[in-house]
Amino acid sequence: MTRGLAPLLPIEFHKMGSFRRPRPRFMSSPLLSELPRFQAARQALQLSSNSAWNSVQTAVINVFKGGGLQSNELYALNESIRRLLKSELGSFITDYFQNQLLAKGLSFVEEKIKQCEGDNRIEVLAEVWDHFFTETLPTLQAIFYPVQGQELTIRQISLLGFRDLVLLKVKLGDLLLLSQSKLPSSVIQMLLILQSVHEPTGPSEGYLQLEELVKQVVSPFLGLSGDRSCSRPTHSLARRHSRVRPKVTVLNYASLMTTVGRPLNEMVLTPLTEQEGEAYLEKCGSVRRHTVANAHSDIQLLAMATMMHSGLGEESGSEDKHLLLPPTFPPPHRQCSSEPSILDSPDEMELEDVASGSQEDSELNCASLS
């Protein structure tokens, strides 16, 4: 038996060895040999990113100093930012702009304002704001056009920076109390525009300080705490005509009940959501940037207001006019005036016809001008 098995063993091992694959070599050896080439390519990419970012920094600081962009420079800056967005620095561009570039650029603006005192400082502030709002801000938006902010856009970040780093540091409130001259319209525009920018985390200390400034120059003023009064003479935006107009009192029971039943948070105007950047445009196409939703409109109130204003232009008497509007209760499911009215059954259609008929009768009987 031993003699019979002995010659079979070499044959069996020979068959197994024929199907065995050769042992693979150390796989990292080719990569180690190409490592210098990869390092050289990475260094070249970093140098390119640094060069692109340096060009962006130089252009932004030059804009804050009052300079402009050269021919075709905007296209080159946009391409540089697109390359940076694809690199490791892409997620830090917005933060670096807010914390470094914007702070450094606005420091030049603050120094220019603080060189003057008294009423001259207010005049310089108005000039600085005009240049910032008409020249600097649009240029910054154009340079950082490819950037899509996470919560705030480049425009909002720039306006918030101007509020915190320029306006609140020049102590405009003290200047307004001491100033006897007429306040420039650019300062009022600046305060109202800055008030329209809101932080995503809610009202900050800077926003509340800004509201105190707005309260000193605008009357009537409606802020987070409601209507406020001020002892200092204020500038009313609606006071444009010096001629005497008759007083008109509008009594609308539906609006009164709606106002009383609505909480304070819903009565305060909420800001529009502003989006910009290439990513947003690719997502939404040609959709408008600002959208006003749930805008309630009353056709009857609009018609009566038109008649009221047309009567004011013809009559110059000082007698009081009282306008009584009938109560209108819109259905709870109607959110917009353009929303179609869909009824489920003929009975509801009959009820609506009866309600509209009674409403027309009440309009003819209750609406009167005395």
From Swiss-Prot:
Keyword list, A-Z: Phosphoprotein, Signal transduction inhibitor, Ubl conjugation
Post-translational modifications: Ubiquitinated. Ubiquitination by RFFL promotes proteasomal degradation of PRR5L thereby modifying the substrate-specific activity of the mTORC2 complex. Ubiquitination by RFFL is stimulated by LPA/lysophosphatidic acid.
Record GO terms (molecular function): ubiquitin protein ligase binding
Modified sites of kind Phosphoserine: S28
Any one of the GO CC terms: TORC2 complex
UniProt-listed Pfam families: HbrB
GO biological process: cellular response to oxidative stress; negative regulation of protein phosphorylation; negative regulation of signal transduction; phosphatidylinositol 3-kinase/protein kinase B signal transduction; positive regulation of intracellular protein transport; positive regulation of mRNA catabolic process; positive regulation of phosphatidylinositol 3-kinase/protein kinase B signal transduction; regulation of fibroblast migration
Region described as Disordered: 327-370
Family matches, as InterPro entries: Bit61/PRR5
Domain of life, source organism: Eukaryota
Assigned protein family: Belongs to the PROTOR family.
Function text: Associates with the mTORC2 complex that regulates cellular processes including survival and organization of the cytoskeleton. Regulates the activity of the mTORC2 complex in a substrate-specific manner preventing for instance the specific phosphorylation of PKCs and thereby controlling cell migration. Plays a role in the stimulation of ZFP36-mediated mRNA decay of several ZFP36-associated mRNAs, such as TNF-alpha and GM-CSF, in response to stress. Required for ZFP36 localization to cytoplasmic stress granule (SG) and P-body (PB) in response to stress.
PANTHER family: PROLINE-RICH PROTEIN 5-LIKE (PTHR32428:SF3), TARGET OF RAPAMYCIN COMPLEX 2 SUBUNIT BIT61-RELATED (PTHR32428)
Subunit organization: Interacts with the mammalian target of rapamycin complex 2 (mTORC2) which contains MTOR, MLST8, PRR5, RICTOR, MAPKAP1 and DEPTOR. Interacts with RFFL. Interacts (via C-terminus) with ZFP36 (via C-terminus); this interaction may accelerate ZFP36-mediated mRNA decay during stress. Interacts with RICTOR.
Protein name (record): Proline-rich protein 5-like
Species in which this protein is naturally found: Rattus norvegicus (Rat)
Gene: Prr5l
